[in-house]
Amino acid sequence: MMIAERGVRASARGVLSLHHIGKTYPRVMPRSKRGVWGMFGHPGRRAVDDAHTAHGPCSGARETDAAEHSVLSDVNLSFFTGEIHALLGKNGAGKSTLAHILSGFCVPTHGQLRLDGKEQRFSVPFDALRAGIGIVHQQPVFAERATVFENVVMGSAALTGVRWVRRAQVRERIDRIIAQWRMPLKKEEYVACLSADKRFFVSLLCVLFRNPRFIILDEPRCAPAQSRAVFFSHLEEFFVRSSHAPRCGGGVIVVTHRFADALRWAQRISLIEGGKACSFLRTDLLDEYCSAHQVNECIQKVSCALMSASTVTSSAVSSFSSLSDTQSCATVPRTSSARPWVLRVESLQVSKHADVPLTDISFSVAASAIIGIVGTPEDGVHVLEDILCDMHAGASRTHCTGNILLQEHDQVWCLPLQRNTPSLLRAHGVACVPSNCIQRGASMQLTLFDLLVPYTLRTWRTRVRAQMRFVARLLAEEEIYCDPLQPACTLSGGQLQRVILARELATRPRLLILAEPAEGLDSASEQRLLARLRQVAQAGTALVLLAREQHQAQWRALCTERFLLRAGTLCAEVSGTPSPSQDSHT
């Protein structure tokens, strides 16, 4: 259901427009092979060509020279102040790349970017901030040892031209923004001590402090669903419709893969597929042309389209004739108590001197079992993740007591909490997929080849051709049809998480710790992940899933046991299939 745009816009509204924007990335040689293969050619090139021949090129991408990878192609879009514009699409469609071009983090290969009719060239994010465009990243980066106040004012002197800052006035302004938006922040808090939700608000505070005209929200997952409604209402009240924003209202660009949220909060929706803007929808005209039943039917069918593995085109979105509803995931059979346990946590405690204390955490995971632990960052779920994956530092490591036991071939190993390392976990068959895949699970400067190889084919006897076939096979299994020699930064957040999971499963672990499994995944990727985890569990691998909010019914049905982490304590345990009353609240 595509409704054409009509009416005359007010001349006072700001316009941010893209004209024939395209972005391609050159192929990069793996770091370990650049010296020799740069002269004589890469011996694994045939494996890559075979993979492309077997599975076909990336759906929707334009054909380019073999030395390039196309991410965006001929994108034409316009964004206006005084409204919320949603960029909707599946993982890898090009939404985040488009947001990075708008915010100066990425330079387009060709095309023009115009602000109020004037061509703009953003070489660095500082240029975009000066023009009034700020971005709130999905995984923001801060000065960890600085306070919230210091992170907010950092760089303000270069942006405003004022070499000195009146602390009293700046503090008053920051306090006013925090109070107005009801942010759970304190200026004196150190960023290293903040949870993922609070770090999102710090990034938003940094953008609002610079009084932007456009705010870009890249996959905003600031809080559970009930709090997201409050956040978007504040966003529309205090920024989009506010008379204090530049030119009587600001513009918001939301990058998301959730059509229900986009239809609820955005005035305009653009569908990005295969690096192209293939469809456009004005939600303010739905009430005029459609009934409530038709709108609900539109939500269901577009959600099914985004969940479908096939390419979503404008005709498919407009007709909705060949789309079907999705089926829920089947429940994994309960684990027999006779199976040996793989992981046992006994009386794990983090004292009150740490950032978030934990009290008497005890549970065990048997082979083929799936344990789900749900809790907010304030309850300590991220601290538990750091301890289990051994990524904790500082007070959490110093004040941590208890036992973490691993059973392997009838031998029990007790991991030293103060001296444990990730390499020791891997030596005992433990694989980890962290919640922050960009900073903890990957290096964005590496190629996909370098990212996938190190934990499996790492011996000097393994030839490059075999390594390249291995990488191409992993990418093909995840339905990511791209060149293994392209940089990891060209992948979307959801694609990167799928690639890291494939890398960890390639090691054939006995225990898999997966944090925030549904973070940044669209419906199709989420269904694929559910099926993959079910197969892994049936093969004998024990799984521990850590999440900060309740997932849908199929996720709860996937777990053989579920725990709730509240105030640093496992206060509840639910087993079996969820009741109908629980499903109704999802």
UniProtKB/Swiss-Prot annotation:
Subunit structure: The complex is probably composed of two ATP-binding proteins (RfuB), two transmembrane proteins (RfuC and RfuD) and a solute-binding protein (RfuA).
Any GO CC annotation of this UniProt entry: plasma membrane
Primary localization: membrane
Keywords noted in UniProt: ATP-binding, Cell inner membrane, Cell membrane, Membrane, Nucleotide-binding, Repeat, Translocase, Transport
Major enzyme class: translocase
E.C. number(s) listed in UniProt: 7.6.2.-
GO MF, one example: ATP binding
Keyword presence, Glycosyltransferase: no
UniProt binding sites for ATP: 89-96
The ABC transporter domain, residue ranges: 46-299, 343-586
Species name: Treponema pallidum (strain Nichols)
Function noted in UniProt: Probably part of the ABC transporter complex RfuABCD involved in riboflavin import. Probably responsible for energy coupling to the transport system.
Membrane topology recorded in Swiss-Prot or TrEMBL: Peripheral membrane protein
InterPro entries per UniProt: ABC_carbohydrate_import_ATPase, ABC_transporter-like_ATP-bd, ABC_transporter-like_CS, P-loop_NTPase
Keyword Membrane attributed: yes
Compartment(s) of residence: Cell inner membrane
Family: Belongs to the ABC transporter superfamily.
Taxon lineage: Bacteria, Pseudomonadati, Spirochaetota, Spirochaetia, Spirochaetales
Protein name: Probable riboflavin import ATP-binding protein RfuB
